[in-house]
């Protein structure tokens, strides 16, 4: 017999109340329970937004900021589509704190009017997430990786037909004049294109990922975990604040121009980063071959470049293929490792690092053709060279000491060609993956605007969203989600 239960009005009310309170998407509940947006927003931002002068705000600061963060978490490509989501989703609207959905112009004005305040939110989150990164992996959190890219603006010059038309004309010109095979129409096209977009002189020509484009250039600093630590937007204000940067005329080589420009931007960008976050003191720098210059090694590894006795201990930078290494004291291979005097193809074996009384390091290299032999009388082991053509009369074989401070380019606190170098330098790709992530997944690519402030704000908001991701992943004890929350949404 089926038992019957008498329903009371109180039970019906209780069920309805429970449904009303709990019928909310789980992901929004996670954000609501674990992220305190008031803790992240500086009081100066709140005072600026709710200034005593001007009109009363119809839309709360928290609501606007949450909406823009949600847009990037869900990879909603346009502001108009975000507003459509808000209009049709009551739970999303209530979570953000809107009683009425704003129009698109409100979103745009918010970005443009409060760009400096958004930067403060980002900087606040960097300090908040630093201990989280160290708790996840202290070694990778101590790394600093830099790379640059650009936000493509919505201008005529970024239409693929624009570059293709010029290249096609140059190919036809070369064919008509019987140019030899050394003529490169792509380099010629780069040289003939204008240095900036006609709509805005601040939208500069750049060669990114194998194609020509017109962009607002920016720089990204991440740690070894791929978490953003600093964003620099290379506009007129940045150049004014760093008069030491001299912008030269472009050459015929787009790759060369990018390398030269990146090398000039590195130290000013790092100085800005360490000035904003004096408690962050990473010891390892990773960069590509664009930074392979004696001047940069000296600034990165010695002196007070980033503060009182504040500099990197190691710099993982591959050698530029156009310039090799030379050592007046001994023969060295392409990685700076000393070679046997009788055989240039035989590198010596790294046998450890020692620190002298004055604190300076030296690297010890020994002949690879030695073995340790036990002395029967003393019971101790000693080196014995078994080379058929020894380069020295010493029984221990050739031993060479290298002093890194004499040549920081050859020995930037570490030794190229070793297993440690290979394993560490692979981590540098984290910054490239991060740039791709903020462009493709955090809605930075494909923005249909050429307004500098709007795109700058979009870049900062992408950084804010990634750091919010780190905070939430830490709160729910799932560090595998520090780069993306998409698995939690599905």
Regions found by a protein language model. Name each.
Residues 27-70, 74:
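Basic, short loop/linker segments at the boundary and entry of helix-turn-helix/winged-helix-like folds
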């Amino acid at each position: 017999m089926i038992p019957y239960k008498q329903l009371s009005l109180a039970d019906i009310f209780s069920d309805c109340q429970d449904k009303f309170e709990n019928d909310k998407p789980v992901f929004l509940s996670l954000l609501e329970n674990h992220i305190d947006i008031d803790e992240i927003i500086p009081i100066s931002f709140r005072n600026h937004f709710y200034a005593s002068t001007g009109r009363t705000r119809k839309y709360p600061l928290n609501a606007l900021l949450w909406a823009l963060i949600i847009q990037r978490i869900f990879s909603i490509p346009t502001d108009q589509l975000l507003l459509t989501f808000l209009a049709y989703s009551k739970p999303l609207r209530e979570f953000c704190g809107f009683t009425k959905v704003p129009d698109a112009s409100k979103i745009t004005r918010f970005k443009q009017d409060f760009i400096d305040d958004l930067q403060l939110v980002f900087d606040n989150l960097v300090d908040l997430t630093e201990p989280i990164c160290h708790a996840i992996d202290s070694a990778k959190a101590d790394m600093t990786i830099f790379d640059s890219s650009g936000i493509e603006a919505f201008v005529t010059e970024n239409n693929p037909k624009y570059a293709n038309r010029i290249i096609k004309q140059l190919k036809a010109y070369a064919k008509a004049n019987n140019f030899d095979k050394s003529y490169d129409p792509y380099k010629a096209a780069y040289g003939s294109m204008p240095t900036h977009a006609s709509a805005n002189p601040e939208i500069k020509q750049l060669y990114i990922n194998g194609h020509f484009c017109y962009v607002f250039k920016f720089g990204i600093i991440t740690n070894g975990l791929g978490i953003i630590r600093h964003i620099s937007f290379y506009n007129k204000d940045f150049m004014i604040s760093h008069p030491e940067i001299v912008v030269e005329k472009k050459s015929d080589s787009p790759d060369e121009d990018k390398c030269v420009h990146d090398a000039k931007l590195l130290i000013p960008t790092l100085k800005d980063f360490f000035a904003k976050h004096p408690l962050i003191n990473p010891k390892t720098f990773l960069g590509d071959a664009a930074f392979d210059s004696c001047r940069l090694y000296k600034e990165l590894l010695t002196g007070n470049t980033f503060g009182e006795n504040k500099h990197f201990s190691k710099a993982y930078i591959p050698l530029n293929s156009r310039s090799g290494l030379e050592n007046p004291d001994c023969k060295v291979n392409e990685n700076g490792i000393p070679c046997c005097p009788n055989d240039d193809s035989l590198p010596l074996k790294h046998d450890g690092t020692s620190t002298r009384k004055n604190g300076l390091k030296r690297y010890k290299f020994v002949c690879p053709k030695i073995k340790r032999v036990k002395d029967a009388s003393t019971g101790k082991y000693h080196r014995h060279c078994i080379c058929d053509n020894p380069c020295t009369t010493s029984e221990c074989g050739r031993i060479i000491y290298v002093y890194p401070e004499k040549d920081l380019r050859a020995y930037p606190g570490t030794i190229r060609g070793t297993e440690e170098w290979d394993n560490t330098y692979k981590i540098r790709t984290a910054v490239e993956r991060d740039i791709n992530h903020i462009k493709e997944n955090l809605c930075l690519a494909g923005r249909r605007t050429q307004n500098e402030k709007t795109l700058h704000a979009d870049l900062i908001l992408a950084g804010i969203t990634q750091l919010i991701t780190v905070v939430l992943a830490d709160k729910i004890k799932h560090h595998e989600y520090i780069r993306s929350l998409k698995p939690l949404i599905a």
